Amino acid sequence: SAFFFTVAAYHSWALPRPGSDTRNSSGRSAADIFKEFFDTFRSFFRKKQIWVAIAFMLLYRLPEAQLVKLINPFLLDPVDIGGLGLSTSQVGFVYGTVGIIGLTLGGIIGGIMAARGGLKKWLWPMAWSMSLTCLTFVYLSYADAPSLLTVNVCVFIEQFGYGFGFTAYMLYLIYFSEGSHKTAHYAICTGFMALGMMLPGMAAGWLQETIGYR
């Protein structure tokens, strides 16, 4: 807690204060607050190509949304039912250490590439990166007793691709939220982002029980 307090105090001092970041000291009635609340949603859904944007928010992470719910069960389940039969400690290292390293590196490199070439140039490569790297788990599901090293490499590739591809997703949300009420609009976008993970994830377990890991 002391560390977080120190970091928060530093950021309070170091971060810039743009002119738009000012406290509204004028007295407002409850009716005005509710009116602004609904105006925020109204202006969001009146944005240009809003339904295309919502479809993008919901579908961009579709493969990952289904995969992420089943990674741990797949790694832990016995071999005779299609899993890899890893121990809990092995899964902790594979997904909690190697996977996090891949995710972090992918995000850093994705940010560098997007800063140099822009979102328009990197959107499709990042989208393919997020989806195609999920095929590493297709390989693991068909591989005959893959070694722990192979599992680590596959998880690293998949998580690296996810981190790299997620950069484009976050930049798109930021760009789409620009304009009036941009902070509130970004919050609404993150709600659709969460929905895009939750809905496919709800069906992932049913699909696995129906067709198995293969």
Summary of predicted features, one role per range:
Residues G19-V52:
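Juxtamembrane intracellular "pre-TM" segments in multi-pass secondary transporters
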Residues W128-P146:
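C-terminal ends and interior cores of transmembrane alpha-helices
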Residues F164-E178:
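Intracellular juxtamembrane helix-capping segments at the cytosolic ends
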Residues T88-S89, G179-C189:
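Loop-to-transmembrane helix entry/capping segments in MFS-fold secondary transporters
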Residues S1-A2, W206-R214:
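A membrane-interface helix-boundary motif in multi-pass transporters
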